[in-house]
């Protein structure tokens, strides 16, 4: 199965009714997203060996919240949705959609917000980004979207991605239309922008018990059935790993068919779990999975592979 976004005027009345039964997509709810993430990162930093880095990530998430309200985005995506729907492509495809200079405006605003909070190497990094040319910034963005991580240092990548993510999340929040599940391929990528997930979550509330993958760029969540590999869609050789016990709120789902794993967060076991924060705070589980020979099928926006990884 794949997910395609259909313009409102192309949906029949029956589709408009059934589209809400099991929502294929959950668009980002930006009002509380960054504040909730920052709070969760700070909470997880307590008694965590990665505490300093989690607090650093919390500063970026808080800055995203501030910049979101200071620099709103106005854009009519109706034509883009129609074109993408006709082509069967993600409407905000990172490999196709031209980048507006708005994202660089967001980056400069993030840097201005973060500067008073930074010191040492981190301050040097954002000052270096502040001095970079427009083309240099575009080249780094293109490299990240192409997974050419050797071209962007791992200390610059989180800041570049934070601005790109904010821009794409703003666009995703403006999408007019409904999502429809169809047969297709590449379900492991975000149907809105084509980026990778950061983790998956089994939710509570109106989507009780359903698993959604969380996009590491546009913050959209898309439905993928449980007990099926989110990377290759096979189901015969899945294993579940945790550092605590079978009732752990964070597990890794590994697949022996493709040799990858993705974390699953369970809201029913810990309602506070957050897709980015809890993934970042559980790197010990990633180390265990690497020891077992599995490759991660996702990327955390605060932790990019370095050169040679």
UniProtKB/Swiss-Prot annotation:
Pfam family, one: FdhE_C
Gene Ontology CC annotations of this record: cytosol
MF terms (GO), sorted A to Z: ferric iron binding
CDD domains: FdhE
Main location: cytoplasm
SUPFAM superfamilies, alphabetized: FdhE-like (SSF144020)
Protein origin, superkingdom: Bacteria
GO biological process: protein maturation
InterPro entries: FdhE-like_sf, FdhE_C, FdhE_central, FdhE_N, Formate_DH_accessory
Keyword list, A-Z: Cytoplasm
UniProt subcellular location: Cytoplasm
The keyword Cytoplasm is annotated on this UniProt entry: yes
Family as reported in the entry's similarity comment: Belongs to the FdhE family.
NCBIfam families named in the record: FdhE, PRK03564.1
Annotated function: Necessary for formate dehydrogenase activity.
Protein name according to UniProt: Protein FdhE homolog
